[in-house]
């Protein structure tokens, strides 16, 4: 959140509310996963969904203020909005709801998807597009914004759309990874440079797995299987791409083109 709001002249009250409440809400969410699915688990997850909702309102406020250009701002703001979907699906998972008759696993993974691919990846895309003047990074930012909801639509309604969205997201992911490597070359801190490189490598590996999975599932011979995707793709995205990437950009700070 702070990476998104660094250019604001003064913190918006929605930003302040989200930042102050996110830690206690996150701790309650952890407790939610210690409880059996049901009312108690859902109640413990609701504060996190509320934080995600406030974050989304902050994103809407920024879109109304900034408009749809430049691409890097729209990517940052879109990430703020998409996280609300992740919060809602997380509550649904903890309660035991199965929207669209999805399995419990898919409901949980959808919540996770909108926190990482839906929230953090657009933020990384925005930071990369801001730091590099090449238009390909603007295109990657717009592509991520489109691919996140398209993936959800494809999973729900249309396998061909799902494959297209997965390939689009993977292509944009590779562009973002390359952009982070360019930033790493000129990073002021060696630790930030290393973290950006590791984040980029993780992103490329994760997107390779996602591409293979989407194509093989469409052809009726899914590989890797969902538990393996959750283990490898999920871990690469959560701990590699996102954690290391956010850590690196926090150290380095948003960069304008040199």
Language model segments and positions:
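Hydrophobic alpha-helical transmembrane segments of multi-pass integral membrane proteins
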Residues: 1-258
């Amino acid at each position: 959140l702070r990476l998104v709001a660094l250019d604001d002249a003064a913190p918006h009250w929605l930003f302040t509310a989200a930042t102050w409440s996110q830690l206690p809400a996150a701790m309650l969410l952890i407790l939610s996963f210690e409880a059996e699915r049901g009312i108690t688990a859902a109640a413990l997850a609701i504060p996190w969904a509320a934080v995600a909702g406030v974050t989304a309102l902050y994103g809407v406020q920024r879109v109304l203020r900034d408009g749809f250009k430049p691409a890097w701002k729209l990517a940052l703001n879109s990430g703020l909005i998409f996280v609300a979907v992740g919060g809602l699906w997380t509550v649904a998972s903890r309660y035991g709801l199965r929207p669209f008759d999805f399995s419990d696993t898919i409901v949980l993974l959808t919540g996770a998807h909108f926190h990482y691919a839906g929230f953090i990846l657009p933020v990384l895309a925005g930071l990369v597009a801001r730091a590099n003047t090449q238009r390909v990074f603007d295109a990657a930012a717009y592509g991520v914004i489109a691919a996140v909801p398209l993936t959800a639509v494809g999973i729900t309604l249309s396998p061909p759309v799902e494959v297209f969205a997965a390939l689009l997201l993977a292509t944009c992911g590779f562009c973002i990874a390359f952009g982070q490597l360019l930033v790493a070359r000129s990073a002021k801190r060696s630790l930030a440079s290393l973290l950006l490189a590791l984040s980029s490598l993780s992103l490329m590996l994760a997107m390779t797995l996602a591409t293979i999975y989407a194509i093989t599932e469409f052809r009726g011979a899914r590989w890797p299987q969902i538990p393996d995707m959750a283990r490898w793709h999920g871990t690469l995205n959560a701990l590699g791409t996102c954690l290391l990437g956010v850590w690196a950009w926090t150290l380095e700070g948003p960069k304008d083109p040199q």
